[in-house]
From Swiss-Prot:
Species this chain originates from: Oryza sativa subsp. japonica
Biological role stated in the UniProt entry: Transcriptional activator that binds specifically to the DNA sequence 5'-[AG]CCGAC-3' of the cis-acting dehydration-responsive element (DRE). Binding to the C-repeat/DRE element mediates high salinity- and dehydration-inducible transcription.
The name this protein goes by in its record: Dehydration-responsive element-binding protein 2A
Main location: nucleus
Chain spans, region Disordered: 1-75
Record GO terms (molecular function): DNA-binding transcription factor activity; transcription cis-regulatory region binding
Higher taxonomy: Eukaryota, Viridiplantae, Streptophyta, Embryophyta, Tracheophyta
Gene Ontology cellular component annotations, sorted alphabetically: nucleus
Pfam annotation, one family: AP2
DNA-binding region, residue intervals: 75-132
Family statement: Belongs to the AP2/ERF transcription factor family. ERF subfamily.
UniProt KW keywords: Activator, DNA-binding, Nucleus, Stress response, Transcription, Transcription regulation
Length: 274
């Protein structure tokens, strides 16, 4: 009986202790722990010794299907989302220490800044942080699920933009870059004078061709007249009569006689032609 009672007493004593988290205030609070690590780092810097850089750690976060809806889209170090939407931050203490709970926050950005503050206090200049000292980018490591759906989904174009895209192309004018849409009236005013110029040029060319053709006809007619004038007919002359006239003239020259008469008391000559 005594042994049984002793065993029952041992079982009642071996009760599982509940794990308690550090409070934000108090002697063993989160703030006191961070302060203590900050003092340790200052001592190391004064001794010209440096602490080993922390490990990169895993960026997996929660297991697949665990955590909040936006947990898989967040890449902040030491930050994860609960199933009910709250964001929490944790950091592991140096020298393979235990994880330090930094608290829960309404946004992932606040949780990331809390992690950076604790990391600089624990690891000093070798700390791996989410933001640099001069960086204030709030969307560098976390993107909400709706925004990702909008970026990955099909792009929707408003009706006004569709009308603009379906409108005729714009014409770029010379000079400064000014885009304008041509009007039908302007196009007609610019095209009609060109058509008229073409018509006038065509009519002038036709007139010039006709005039040249007329000149050629006149020249041909004048040439025909001249040719007719040159080709004179000899029907108006009698060849036999002309020959007889030539013979008569030759015979008259042969019948010319010169008589020299010498008379007493006259020293000259006298010529008589018959």
């Amino acid at each position: 009986m005594e042994r049984g009672e002793g065993r029952r007493g041992d079982c009642s004593v071996q009760v599982r202790k509940k794990r308690t988290r550090r409070k934000s205030d108090g002697p063993d609070s989160i703030a006191e722990t961070i302060k203590w690590w900050k003092e340790q780092n200052q001592k190391l810097q004064e001794e010209n010794s440096s602490r080993k850089a922390p490990a990169k750690g895993s960026k997996k976060g929660c297991m697949a299907g665990k955590g909040g809806p936006e947990n898989s889209n967040c890449a902040y170090r030491g930050v994860r989302q609960r199933t009910w939407g709250k964001w929490v931050a944790e950091i592991r203490e140096p020298n393979r220490g235990r994880r330090l709970w930094l608290g829960s926050f309404p946004t992932a950005l606040e949780a990331a800044h809390a992690y950076d503050e604790a990391a600089r206090a624990m690891y000093g200049p070798t700390a791996r942080v989410n933001f640099a000292d001069n960086s204030t980018d709030a969307n560098s490591g976390c993107t909400s699920a709706p925004s990702l759906m909008m970026s990955n989904g099909p792009a929707t174009i408003p009706s006004d933009e569709k009308d603009e895209l379906e409108s005729p192309p714009f014409i770029v004018a010379n000079g400064p870059a000014v885009l304008y849409q041509p009007d039908k009236k302007d196009v007609l005013e610019r095209v009609v004078p060109e058509v008229q110029d073409v018509k006038t040029e065509g009519s002038n060319g036709l007139k010039r061709v006709c005039q040249e053709r007329k000149n050629m006809e006149v020249c041909e007619s004048e040439g025909i007249v001249l040719h007719k004038e040159v080709n004179i007919s000899y029907d108006y002359f009698n060849v036999h009569e002309v020959v007889e006239m030539i013979i008569v003239e030759l015979s008259a020259d042969q019948k010319t006689e010169v008589h020299e008469e010498y008379q007493e008391g006259d020293d000259g000559f006298s010529l008589f032609s018959y």
